[in-house]
Amino acid sequence: MSDSQPGSTSSTGGKSDSGYIPGDDTWTQWRNIFAILTGKMTDEGKEQFRIARDIRNEAADCKRCEDQRDYLLQYSPIIRFLSDNIRQLGGDLSSHNIYCRRCTSRKAGGFDPEYGILLCANEMKDQGHLEDTMAHEMVHAYDHLRFKVDWTDNLRHAACTEIRASSLSGECRWAREFFRRGQWKFTQQHQECVRRRAILSVRARPGCKDEAHAEKVVNEVWDSCFRDTRPFDEIYR
């Protein structure tokens, strides 16, 4: 028998060279978890484990996401405020066009002017994370209606709405950065978080050449876009 190729399955219990063992039973799951904890699973194996877990938990993840989405639409002050302001501009975001789905890329959500908001149910850590993500995407929706954002070709537009969404959604507040992302700074923390996340978002767009290009575009619009807190009177949280 020939040696197993990288990423292929060997003859020992289905285990691959990545350290990941396919299977949904409890024993196999524990073996995979211990392989991760002891450093015996490669990054490729960890990704295989994550994908299998997300597929296995898809129905439960989406149900939890939908329940939390509906609760936030009814009771969250920031979500209700953004919903009201979007409605005043002629838009409508509610459970019929805020979708909870399993995503294959590592992102929390997205906004599409034609279809609405996508929430990646398999990436949501808790209801607070879902609230931040909804608020972020709803700021994009507000900007689309209020400022006629060119999502396709204008990187300055993209940078501006990313700055505003990261700043106003709450995802860059100190507690979120400190406890979830391990950012320990006390001074200028909010601004640095907003800038970092805006650069990452712009960098991922097709028209952006590289990180230096993304940083340049963000810097060009930073002052005016960071100061613009509409529809809030100030940064809400």
UniProtKB/Swiss-Prot annotation:
It is found in: Mitochondrion inner membrane. Residues 1-23 are annotated as: Disordered. Keywords: Hydrolase, Membrane, Metal-binding, Metalloprotease, Mitochondrion, Mitochondrion inner membrane, Protease. One of its GO terms (cellular component) is mitochondrial inner membrane. It is an enzyme of class 3 (hydrolase). GO terms for biological process: mitochondrial protein processing; mitochondrial proton-transporting ATP synthase complex assembly. Its EC number is 3.4.24.-. The keyword Aminoacyl-tRNA synthetase does not apply. Residues 1-19 have a biased composition (Low complexity). Coiled coil: none annotated. A divalent metal cation binds at H136, H140. The active site is at E137. GO terms for molecular function: metal ion binding; metalloendopeptidase activity. Has a dual role in the assembly of mitochondrial ATPase. Acts as a protease that removes N-terminal residues of mitochondrial ATPase CF(0) subunit 6 at the intermembrane space side. Also involved in the correct assembly of the membrane-embedded ATPase CF(0) particle, probably mediating association of subunit 6 with the subunit 9 ring. This is Mitochondrial inner membrane protease atp23.
